[in-house]
Amino acid sequence: MNQEVLNIFNPVQAAPTFDQIRISLASPEKIRSWSFGEIKKPETINYRTFKPERDGLFCARIFGPTKDYECLCGKYKRMKYKGIICEKCGVEVTLARVRRERMGHIELASPVAHIWFLKSLPSRIAMMLDMPLKDIERVLYFEYYIVTEPGLTPLKQHQLLSEDDYMRAQEEYGDDSFTAEIGAEAIQNLLKAIDLEKEAERLREELSGTVSDMKQKKFSKRLKILEAFQESGNRPEWMVLTVVPVIPPELRPLVPLDGGRFATSDLNDLYRRVINRNNRLKRLIELRAPDIIIRNEKRMLQESVDALFDNGRRGRVITGANKRPLKSLADMLKGKQGRFRQNLLGKRVDYSGRSVIVVGPELKLHECGLPKKMALELFKPFIYARLDAKGLSGTVKQSKRMVEREQPQVWDILEEVIREHPVLLNRAPTLHRLGIQAFEPKLIEGKAIQLHPLVCAAFNADFDGDQMAVHVPLSLEAQLEARVLMMSTNNILSPANGRPIIVPSQDIVLGLYYLSVARDGEPGEGKIFADLGEIEAAMDAGVVSLHAKIKARHTEMTPEGVLLRKVIDTTPGRMKIAALLPHHPQIGHRLIEKALTKKEIGNLIDIVYRHCGQKATVIFADKVMGLGFKEAAKAGISFGKDDIIIPVRKTAIVEETRKLAEEYEQQYADGLITKGEKYNKVVDAWAKATDRVADEMMAELQMKHKDENGREKEINAIYMMAHSGARGSQAQMKQLGGMRGLMAKPSGEIIETPIVSNFKEGLTVQEYFNSTHGARKGLADTALKTANSGYLTRRLVDVAQDCIIVEEDCGTTKGITLRAVVEGGDVLVSLGSRVLGRFTAEDVKDPGTGELVVPADTYIDENIADAIEAAVVQSVKVRSVLTCEAKIGVCGACYGRDLARGTPVNIGEAVGVIAAQSIGEPGTQLTMRTFHIGGTAQVAEQSFFEASNEGTVRVIGPTVVGSDGALVIMSRNTSVSVLVDGKERETYKPPYGARLRVKDGDLVKRGQRLGDWDPYTTPIITEVAGKIRAEDLVDGLSIREEVDEATGIAQRVVADWRTSARGSDLRPAMGVLSEDGSYKRLSNGGEARYLLSAGAILSVADGDEVKPGEVIARIPTEGAKTRDITGGLPRVAELFEARRPKDCAVIAEMDGRVEFGKDYKNKRRIKITPDVDADGNQPEAVEFLIPKGKHIAVHDGDYITKGEYIIDGNPDPHDILRILGVEALANFLVDEIQEVYRLQGVPINDKHIETIVRQMLQKVEILEPGDTGLIKGDHLDKPEFDKEQEKAIARGGRPAVTQPVLLGITKASLQTKSFISAASFQETTRVLTEASVHGKTDTLEGLKENVIVGRLIPAGTGSYLRSLQRVAAKRDEQLAQQREDAMEPLPAEIALSDAE
């Protein structure tokens, strides 16, 4: 009874709970069943009375009353008449809220095609009827008749007839011998006539019978849509509307403005046009108007309904009175301002304030300063409640007055309310989850929020006028989550790479660095002190200085855990830092007996976190910050102009390089090198010179100068700032005191003349002009790429949002193999750091002894990682999200460590979103950082390799001895490795044509150069000696003399011979002949003929004698472009979108021998003949057609292995997947993407990239459907396919054959299982059209779709609730089953047996 009473006064029902959402086509019956009445008039409201017109668009009889519990005429008012329908005005007495829910409808006088299914490509109606879209449009818009029933006439089904044809046919065959119709009725009847089952059956037969690819594709597309209609229970004719639904009036409001005008939603205009035309059409039909008029009206009706659904999709856009296009139903949904992104995903939060931030150095790490005024406003409801509870005020009104007057007791209560009630601080843009953190508020005077200095790095905040928003978590659960998960003290490590993010910066670093400096000859050197107090007394007395080398007693913990005091060598400054270190066996004074740079302090915090846990780290960080600020202030470090040192040798180096550049100019003038080569060499020389000047400058800055008493002078202040990492970089110092160096043009090319001056000397006018390019380009790039980076993040989040940890362990034995990242002899990323925080997939054994280092399924922590490093293991197979076999989401063991916590990941962690944020966040950071070095070009070219270990050289692969006795590498797969104690420590694959400085079996020292090559050209080298013969080198066709204007020197360059008809069948080549005029034989049995590609520069002429290892021709490579993230962000996007690169590499599909076949038009034919396989069968050879003029990296007769490049370039990721498989693809993508970030010095953990790649590899393509009933060429999710496959195998059918497909992130997002998520991402119309035809069900598994329907997301706390719901549902099923079992009567079975 109570519930009933409550219902009367509070009619808000709990929203119905649901587990999934289905979208399908609405039948006319369905639309009528939703509707509360037909709308017959286009009127809206009476402009005098403001009452809705009857039967109009706002009719109260259909949609409900405008005021709560009051009919329109006012006969029935108040609650007691609830549910009565007024006999005068026909309005039901109920809540006005029903006007938001009740729909109406319009009965159309003539059917109308739904524009989404007609025009949204691929057109569903056209596919159902198997007709071109153009023809269907002609019929719909009354241009042509369509034959629906040919009868016995020679006309064909679906044939189009113009007006004249139709007349003629009627005369010829008689009126009744055939039927042809026109307009939407015709299309509707054709759709009605389709028998889905028969049609599908027929298509399947045709599919199995056809061989041509085109037809197969066409049939399978059509079959798919037929099956979709069959399975979803939709009828094709529903794509043509006979009834149009009208949405509730409150959702398309009409608002009176002052001055008797109205503001209205565009939908009302659109509906009005539909109703007007519909009514006119009805009247014309009743009046039996001429056909042509009716037809015109029908066409106009079709157009008006089109505009209502999707304005501008067909024909011209319908505009309103103010010439602005009207916003149709489709526009309401799509785009950034549409329903999905603006209102469902972009909800705003209440209880928030925002203000400027200032620094709060005396705060603790978990605190923030909140202005009193702001706190009072934010915590108002809490204050009212507390005032009431304490009996200080009787009513809310009274409380309100007290708070407004700011009476003294209010402040006391505010203190109580705020105590331990965390607030969230957010700084836009929130690029990763550390952009919102929780703090305990501390009331302060003033109007600015105080922020702790150490969290600035996470927020990317600075105090130059940044603003931050404050949000108050209201419910107890929210407060709990804020405290446990979001408190700044819980976010010490960065989720992107697991390194501390709460790291001192700027002043603090400078203070600590200054403290940790030790200097010779300081007062008090060599004294011994008992403790810190004694040192401080001595410093106050001036007996000892901060940097003196002294001895002192220091307490440390032994490995047994006992505190021990011992005398150590230190300085007073270092003692101060040592006093802050927590006691732990692993943490001793040795960690700080060095100059503490920013990096060292970061490592220190990391070590404290690993060994002593979170609490100790927070306390330590706070203390360190205090000390750093204090000491930086005391040190008073400053610098003047004279602190910028210009190196003595600068002029000498510049002159030397000038001479070198002139020499190159001369060589170019003499025709020894090309213009491009000269450019490359000059740029390179100047880049090297700039670096040398910078090194000289740094060396002079570091030199220790002593005064006459032997005391060291103060270190240079600028050097201190840069070296400690407090501010500035070596690149900036180089520009202050060295030389600015090379500049880039806006196009990205490097200007040949460098800027020789530095900022201290001042730039000349010309230099200044040159340097403005870089600066301007930097600023322009920043603006553009911020947007690009944001869009990349959005796509990444969208593709990865449903990747959640769902279980502890999926139990797979698969994994990926990780190796150290080595480049040019330097280990960039060690194996230990790559495998850290993962689970091993199989046993790791010592390569030398074969003994077990780590068993399988072990979590690799720091200690185990060190053990793996120590055992010199080359590679480790670890679990990875790429190989995880969890059905939805991924499992904890495959993911490994939660980087932000340093422990194995928890169930319910949204690892996909974290991955997307970690990759996207630096994108914005980096783009904003392009201009810091002022556009100074850095040429990143590597042209040699050195040994990084001492050992023996082993050269494997073809080489030849050149004229100077050096080995020249003759193949793409020659490898040079260094062995230590017989174990391979490092391996290099130098490029073709590199010259080795060592021979096989030589002993090398560490750092010794093993070989080098010219980075600017690729040579073509002869393997044998003999006489040169030029072939097909026809002057003016395939070769041209390039005479340089500047020098008048000619050189012979191979021209592009395909441009003219005469040269189409030339094959320019250089042959090496023996005495008798035949070709020399090469070691692999081929002829010594070297094909030349366009652009090659000849080094020898016809008839010259050559020796082995001599260069016949050079192919210039592109000039060095600046490697900025400018190349980086688009590169990352290109990789994630899996686009085919422009000039992509051609990859060998199998092992085999290369042959050059007969040429085809202007393509070269390359054939790979594989070896005979184990059964003695000869597999089929593979042919490639390659455009002439491309440089082919293999030679006739070479043996190549699968996956090798036949043509150099960027490989196509799809090829890698097809030829080498998933693991190779993952390695390629991870390495390429990491390279971009590494170049910028941004550390990101590999597993984030792997997570995104997993999402790109979710689909498989059906190659052979077998007996699964799937369609060839279909793309399916792996779990779905597995289900179908199991069914087929269980039936005893043939299994299907599939291959994995790689989808770019945009495509993968649009093809996700959830149509809600896809629709809110991009191409809303297309997604919804497809989903409704297929009758798709969204099971609400990802985060996005749950946010949109307003439920808890299935991650974090929500994932636990989700699992509880699952358990509950299972239990309910079991209980129901038990009940049924209990109810079953027994006698039925007995009766059965009698009957038998």
UniProtKB/Swiss-Prot annotation:
> Keywords in UniProt for this one?
DNA-directed RNA polymerase, Magnesium, Metal-binding, Nucleotidyltransferase, Transcription, Transferase, Zinc
Pfam families annotated for this entry? Answer: RNA_pol_Rpb1_1, RNA_pol_Rpb1_2, RNA_pol_Rpb1_3, RNA_pol_Rpb1_4, RNA_pol_Rpb1_5
Q: Which GO terms describe its biological process?
A: DNA-templated transcription
Alphabetical list of Gene3D superfamilies matching this protein: 1.10.132.30, 1.10.150.390, 1.10.1790.20, 1.10.40.90, 2.40.40.20, 2.40.50.100, RNA polymerase II, clamp domain, RNA polymerase Rpb1, domain 3
Q: State where Mg(2+) binds.
A: D462, D464, D466
Q: What does this protein do?
A: DNA-dependent RNA polymerase catalyzes the transcription of DNA into RNA using the four ribonucleoside triphosphates as substrates.
**Protein name according to UniProt:** DNA-directed RNA polymerase subunit beta'
